[in-house]
C-alpha cells in the first residue's frame, strides 16, 4: 500500500501494552473464490486435422491411341501447425471445446476398358474422419490461492468472473519457494467414468457390432472425470500410459509437448509424450500451488496404433492407464484397404513438428503384368527434399506385406530404391520413376513411401497427385489438404530461440541491478503470445533466473507475479535495458536471436508501527502532565480499512501499547474504557500530548505513528474505600443501649463494591442507620484487618435496677458470741432496692483481695477472699450505691483490690460461692440472675461483717 494521505484524519485512540503485533500481508480476497478449471489434454495446438479424399478413375480407350484416363484422389487435412486452436469458454457456457478435426475421404473408381471381356466395375468408398477434443469442467470448489497482486477475468465460469489472490493457503508458508524436484503423484490424481468411445461408428449388420472405420469419419474418444488432491505441488508428475493398439492424436501424430490447459488457457501441467513407451508424463506447474479443489472432465482424441493394429475387421484391445486407474475395451478396426486396386495411396501420418506428409502408395496389389509402369508424383503446396533421401521404393515379396493399415514393417521389405532413377523436376515438386527399369515386362509389386514438406510460398492449401501410367491404362490418385480453421504457418525446421532473464531484490530501490543485489527465488513468470494466450509458465530458480525455450521469431508478453512481502521497484530506470526493471508486465521480441533482457525488480515492502499511551488524567484537563501516570491493562483493538479486526493488545504497566508490521494504509484504533473511569476531553493540545478519544481513524503513509493517546479520570463521588476488613473482635459485652444513630449519610456515589470482611464479633447493637448510598465501586482492597480488640471502656450507664427482693431468711446460726442481742433472726426482708451505686466507702479494713477475675463475661465469679480481719467497727453503711460503672473491659482481669480504707491483714480469703455462675447476658438482654448475685454478695458481706464485729466484741469483753 502506497497511500500518500497524511496521518491527520484519525479520531481517538489509547496506548497499549508494548506488545509487538505481527500482521500478515493481506492478500486480496480472504474469502475463497470458486473457479472452474478445464483441463485440455494432449493436443496443445499441435494436432493435425486430416480429411483424406481419394478419387481414382480408370478410363481406357477402345484403341491403342486413346488418351489414358486420369484417376484423381483428393485428400484433405486440416492442419494446425504450431498453433493451439483451443476455444475458450464464454461466461454463459461452462464447457470448453477444442476442435481437432481430421476428415479422410477416399473415393476410388476402377473402370476397365470395354475391350475387356469383364464388365466395368465401380468401387467406391467414402470415409470422413472428424476428430474433436473437448474438455469440460465440473465446477466444484476450486479455490484461488494465488499470490498474484492483480485479479484476472475468468470468462469460463458462469457465476465467477474474477480470480482473486489467495489468503491463505499453501503459499503463505513459503511464498517464494522455487519448484522442488517433484514426485510421481499418480495416487493423488483420481480418474473416474473412464471410457473409450467410437465417435459415430459403423454397425456391421452381419455381426451386429459397431466397428471403428479409421478412414471413414470415425474417431476414438478417450473420456474421463478427474480430481486432483490439494497436496499436489508444482513439479509433481503423473502419467497417461496407452496400450499396444491405442495412442493419442489422430492422422497427425501426437505432439511431444502435451500441455494441459484450463478453460482460460492457463497451463495446469506440461506433458511430454514418449512415442517409444507410448506414455505421456505430465508435470504440474505452479497452477496447483495457486488453486485448490481442482476437478473436471475431459475428452481426448485418440487413434488406433496403426503399426500394431494392422488388419481390417479385427478386434483389438484398446487399453489406457490414467494415473493409477486402468481401463480397456475391445474395438474392431477397419482401414478399408482395397486389394484389387493397382494404385492406392494413403497418408500414413502427418509429422506433428514440421507438418510433413508421410505417404504410402501400394503399386500393383493385384500382381498384374505390365510392359510399362511409370510412377509420377506431383506436389502442389509441398516440395520434396532430395537430400533427405526419404523417397523409398520397396519390392514386395510377400502379398501379406500390403498391410491394411498402410503402415508396413519396412524392415521386412526389400529396399530397391537404389535400383531406380528418381528424377526431380519443377523445383522439386515433381518426382518420376520408371518402375520397369529396363525390363520388357514385369508383374512386380511395390510399396513406395515419400515425404512431402509444406511450401510456404504457395497460397494453395496443397495436394499430392499420383499417377501410374501402364501399357493398359493410366491410374491416378489425388490427396488434397485443407485447414479447417484456415491457419497453416509452420515452416519446416525453423530455428528456435530463448527468452527470459532475471528477477532480483532491488535493495536500494533505484530500479537498477547492482552487483551486490541478489535474485529472488520462487517468482511466478507467465509467457503469452501476441494475442494474450498463455504459452508457458515457470518459476524463478534460487538465483532469480528464468527462461522460456523453443520459441520462434515473434512478439511475446511476459508477466511477473509480485512475491508476498515485496513491492515492484521503479520500471525502466536509466537507459540500459539489460539492467533495469521492466515492470510486472513487459513485451519481448525475438528476431533471429535470443532475448534475455526481460527483468523485474522488487524491494521488500516496508512495515510500520503505530501506538503510544493511555494515562490517568487526574486533573481532567485532557493533557498529559509529567506527574500523571499510565493505566495498565486497557484493551486496544486495531481494525483495517474494511473494519476487520487485525490485532488486539493491552497497555503495559506504563500505559504503553504498540502495533507492528503494518503496511501503509488506513486503520482504526479502538480503546475500551476501563470500568469506573470517564473519558477525558479530546484534542485539547498538541497531538502527541492530548487524548484522541475512544476511536481513532489513522492513515499510515511511509512512517510510524506514535501519537495515538487517550486519557481517563475517576469521578470524585465518595472515595469510600469501603473495603473495611474490620476484624472487630470486640468481645465487648457492653449492654450499651447505645442508640448509635450514626446517620452516616455517606452519599458516596462511589459504587462501593466493598469486600468488607468485617468479622466484627462486636455485639454492638449499634442501630447504625448508615444510609450510605455509596455507589463506590472502589475495588479498593483495603484489607484493613482492624483487629479492634476493643477495650471498650463502655461507660455503660447500666442502671442496674436490681430490685433484688432478696428474702434471705438467713437463719445464720452463727456461733457468734456476739452480745449483740442480735438474734440475727434477721428475717431480712432485704427488699434491697439497691441501686448498687456501690460507692462503698466501706471503711471495713476489708482487705478484699477480691481476685474478681471478672472475665467481663460478667460471670461475677467474685472470688471475694474477704478474709477480712477487719477490725471493722464497721458501721457498714453498705449503701451500695453500685452505679455499676461497669468498666466492661471484657477480658479485664480485674484484680479488684477493693481498698476498703481498712489496714487489715490479707487473710479473709472468701471463696466464690458461685462456682457455677452463669455468664452475663448479651448486651441489651435482660437477666435478673446477675442482679441477684450482686444482692447475695452484698448480703453475705454484711453478714460476715456482723459476725466479725460480734466476735471482736466478745473478745473485748
Curated annotation (Swiss-Prot):
**Polar residues composition bias: which ranges?**
56-71, 84-114, 133-164
Q: GO CC annotations?
A: extracellular region
- Asked whether the keyword Zinc is assigned, the reply is no
Classification via Pfam families: Big_8, Gram_pos_anchor, SdrD_B, SdrG_C_C, YSIRK_signal
> Where are the residues of the annotated region Ligand binding A region?
51-495
Q: GO annotations under biological process?
A: cell adhesion
UniProt keywords, alphabetically: Calcium, Cell wall, Peptidoglycan-anchor, Repeat, Secreted, Signal
Q: How does it sit in the membrane?
A: Peptidoglycan-anchor
Residues covered by the CNA-B domain:
496-606, 607-717
| Basic and acidic residues composition bias: residue spans | 72-83
Any idea which residues bear Pentaglycyl murein peptidoglycan amidated threonine here?
923
**Which residue intervals make up region (Disordered)?**
51-166, 678-937
Xref: InterPro entries: Adhesin_Fg-bd_dom_2, Adhesion_dom_sf, Fibrogen-bd_dom1, Ig-like_fold, LPXTG_anchor, SDr-like, Sdr_B, SDR_Ig
Bias class Acidic residues marks the residues at: 685-695, 712-896
- Signal peptide per UniProt: 1-50
Short motif (LPXTG sorting signal): ranges? 920-924
- Regions of compositional bias (Low complexity) in chain numbering: 115-132, 922-937
Query: How does this protein assemble?
Result: Homodimerizes; via N2-Domain. Interacts with host NRXN1; this interaction mediates bacterial attachment to host cells.
Question: According to its UniProt record, which protein family does this protein belong to?
Answer: Belongs to the serine-aspartate repeat-containing protein (SDr) family.
What is known about what this protein does? Cell surface-associated calcium-binding protein which plays an important role in adhesion and pathogenesis. Mediates interactions with components of the extracellular matrix such as host NRXN1 to promote bacterial adhesion.
The name on file for this protein is Serine-aspartate repeat-containing protein C
Amino acid at each position: 500500500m502506497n497511500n500518500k494521505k497524511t496521518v491527520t484524519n484519525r479520531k481517538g485512540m489509547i496506548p497499549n501494552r508494548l506488545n509487538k503485533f505481527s500482521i500478515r500481508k493481506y492478500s486480496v480476497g480472504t474469502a475463497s473464490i470458486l473457479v472452474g478449471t478445464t483441463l485440455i489434454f494432449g493436443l496443445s495446438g499441435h494436432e493435425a486435422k486430416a480429411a483424406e479424399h481419394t478419387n481414382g478413375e480408370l478410363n481406357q480407350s477402345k484403341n491403342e491411341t486413346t488418351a489414358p484416363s486420369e484417376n484423381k484422389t483428393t485428400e484433405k487435412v486440416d492442419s494446425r501447425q504450431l498453433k493451439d486452436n483451443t476455444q475458450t469458454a464464454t461466461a454463459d457456457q461452462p464447457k470448453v471445446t477444442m476442435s481437432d478435426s481430421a476428415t479422410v475421404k477416399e473415393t476410388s473408381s476402377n473402370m476397365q476398358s470395354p475391350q475387356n471381356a469383364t464388365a466395368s466395375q465401380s468401387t467406391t468408398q467414402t470415409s470422413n474422419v472428424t476428430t474433436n477434443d473437448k474438455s469440460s469442467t465440473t465446477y466444484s470448489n476450486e479455490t484461488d490461492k494465488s499470490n498474484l497482486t492483480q485479479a484476472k477475468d475468468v470468462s469460463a465460469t458462469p457465476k465467477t468472473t474474477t480470480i482473486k489472490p489467495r489468503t491463505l493457503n499453501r503459499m503463505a508458508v513459503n511464498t517464494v519457494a522455487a519448484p522442488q524436484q517433484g514426485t510421481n503423484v499418480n495416487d493423488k490424481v483420481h480418474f473416474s467414468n473412464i471410457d473409450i468411445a467410437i465417435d459415430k461408428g459403423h454397425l456391421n449388420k452381419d455381426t451386429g457390432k459397431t466397428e471403428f472405420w479409421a478412414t471413414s469419419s470415425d474417431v476414438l474418444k478417450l473420456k474421463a472425470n478427474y480430481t486432483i488432491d490439494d497436496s499436489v505441488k508444482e513439479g509433481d508428475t503423473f502419467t497417461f500410459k496407452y496400450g499396444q493398439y491405442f495412442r493419442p492424436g489422430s492422422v497427425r501424430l501426437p505432439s511431444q509437448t502435451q500441455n494441459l490447459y484450463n478453460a482460460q488457457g492457463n497451463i495446469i501441467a506440461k506433458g511430454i509424450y514418449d512415442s517409444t513407451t507410448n506414455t505421456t508424463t505430465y508435470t504440474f506447474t505452479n497452477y496447483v500451488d495457486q488453486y485448490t479443489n481442482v476437478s473436471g472432465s475431459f475428452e481426448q482424441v485418440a487413434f488406433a496404433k496403426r503399426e500394431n493394429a494392422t488388419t481390417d475387421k479385427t478386434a483389438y484391445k484398446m487399453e489406457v492407464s490414467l494415473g493409477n486407474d486402468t481401463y480397456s475395451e475391445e474395438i474392431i478396426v477397419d482401414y478399408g484397404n482395397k486389394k484389387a486396386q493397382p494404385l492406392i495411396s494413403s497418408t500414413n501420418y502427418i509429422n506433428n513438428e514440421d507438418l510433413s506428409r508421410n505417404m504410402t502408395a501400394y503399386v500393383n496389389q493385384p500382381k498384374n503384368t505390365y510392359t510399362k509402369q511409370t510412377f509420377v508424383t506431383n506436389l502442389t503446396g509441398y516440395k520434396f527434399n532430395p537430400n533427405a533421401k526419404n523417397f523409398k521404393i520397396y519390392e514386395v515379396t510377400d502379398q501379406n506385406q500390403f498391410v491394411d493399415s498402410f503402415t508396413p514393417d519396412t524392415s521386412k521389405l526389400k529396399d530397391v530404391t537404389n535400383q531406380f532413377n528418381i528424377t526431380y523436376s519443377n523445383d522439386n515438386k515433381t518426382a518420376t520413376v520408371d518402375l520397369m527399369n529396363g525390363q520388357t515386362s514385369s508383374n512386380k509389386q511395390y510399396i513406395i513411401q515419400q515425404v512431402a514438406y509444406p511450401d510456404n510460398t504457395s497460397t494453395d492449401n496443397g495436394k499430392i497427385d499420383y499417377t501410374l501410367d501402364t501399357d493398359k491404362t493410366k491410374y491416378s490418385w489425388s490427396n488434397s489438404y485443407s485447414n479447417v480453421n484456415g491457419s497453416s504457418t509452420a515452416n519446416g525446421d525453423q530455428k528456435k530461440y530463448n527468452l527470459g532473464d532475471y528477477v532480483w531484490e532491488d535493495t536500494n530501490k533505484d530500479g537498477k541491478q547492482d552487483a551486490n543485489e541478489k535474485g529472488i527465488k520462487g517468482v511466478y513468470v507467465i509467457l503469452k503470445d501476441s494475442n494474450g494466450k498463455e504459452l508457458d509458465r515457470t518459476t524463478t530458480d534460487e538465483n532469480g533466473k528464468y527462461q522460456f525455450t523453443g520459441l520462434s521469431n515473434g512478439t511475446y508478453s511476459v508477466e511477473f507475479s509480485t512475491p508476498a512481502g515485496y513491492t515492484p521497484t521503479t520500471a525502466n530506470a536509466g537507459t540500459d535495458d539489460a539492467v533495469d526493471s521492466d515492470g510486472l508486465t513487459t513485451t519481448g521480441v525475438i528476431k533471429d536471436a535470443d532475448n534475455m533482457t526481460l527483468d523485474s525488480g522488487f524491494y521488500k515492502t516496508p512495515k510500520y508501527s503505530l501506538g503510544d499511551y493511555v494515562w490517568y488524567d487526574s486533573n481532567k484537563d485532557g493533557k498529559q502532565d509529567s506527574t500523571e501516570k499510565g493505566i495498565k491493562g486497557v484493551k486496544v483493538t486495531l481494525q483495517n480499512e474494511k473494519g476487520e479486526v487485525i490485532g488486539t493488545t493491552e497497555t503495559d504497566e506504563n500505559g504503553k501499547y504498540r502495533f507492528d508490521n503494518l503496511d501503509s494504509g488506513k486503520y482504526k484504533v479502538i480503546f475500551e474504557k476501563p470500568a469506573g473511569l470517564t473519558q477525558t476531553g479530546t484534542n485539547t493540545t498538541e497531538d502527541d500530548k492530548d487524548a484522541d478519544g475512544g476511536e481513532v481513524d489513522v492513515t499510515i503513509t511511509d512512517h510510524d505513528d506514535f501519537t495515538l493517546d487517550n486519557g481517563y479520570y475517576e469521578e470524585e463521588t465518595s472515595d469510600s474505600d469501603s473495603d473495611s476488613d474490620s476484624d472487630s473482635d470486640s468481645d465487648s459485652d457492653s449492654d450499651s443501649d447505645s442508640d448509635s444513630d450514626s446517620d452516616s449519610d455517606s452519599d458516596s456515589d462511589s459504587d462501593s463494591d466493598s469486600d468488607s470482611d468485617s468479622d466484627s464479633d462486636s455485639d454492638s447493637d449499634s442501630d447504625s442507620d448508615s444510609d450510605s448510598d455509596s455507589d463506590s465501586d472502589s475495588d479498593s482492597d483495603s484489607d484493613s484487618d482492624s483487629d479492634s480488640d476493643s477495650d471498650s471502656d463502655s461507660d455503660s450507664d447500666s442502671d442496674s435496677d436490681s430490685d433484688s427482693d432478696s428474702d434471705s431468711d438467713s437463719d445464720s446460726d452463727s456461733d457468734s458470741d456476739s452480745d449483740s442481742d442480735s438474734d440475727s433472726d434477721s428475717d431480712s426482708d432485704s427488699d434491697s432496692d439497691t441501686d448498687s451505686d456501690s460507692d462503698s466507702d466501706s471503711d471495713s479494713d476489708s482487705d478484699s483481695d477480691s481476685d474478681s477475675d471478672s472475665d467481663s463475661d460478667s460471670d461475677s465469679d467474685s472470688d471475694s477472699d474477704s478474709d477480712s480481719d477487719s477490725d471493722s467497727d464497721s458501721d457498714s453503711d453498705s449503701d451500695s450505691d453500685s452505679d455499676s460503672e461497669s468498666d466492661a473491659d471484657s477480658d479485664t482481669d480485674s484484680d479488684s483490690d477493693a481498698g476498703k480504707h481498712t489496714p487489715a491483714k490479707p487473710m479473709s480469703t472468701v471463696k466464690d460461692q458461685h462456682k457455677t455462675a452463669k455468664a452475663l447476658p448479651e448486651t441489651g438482654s435482660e437477666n435478673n440472675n446477675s442482679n441477684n448475685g450482686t444482692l447475695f454478695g452484698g448480703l453475705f458481706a454484711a453478714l460476715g461483717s456482723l459476725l466479725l464485729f460480734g466476735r471482736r466484741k466478745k473478745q473485748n469483753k
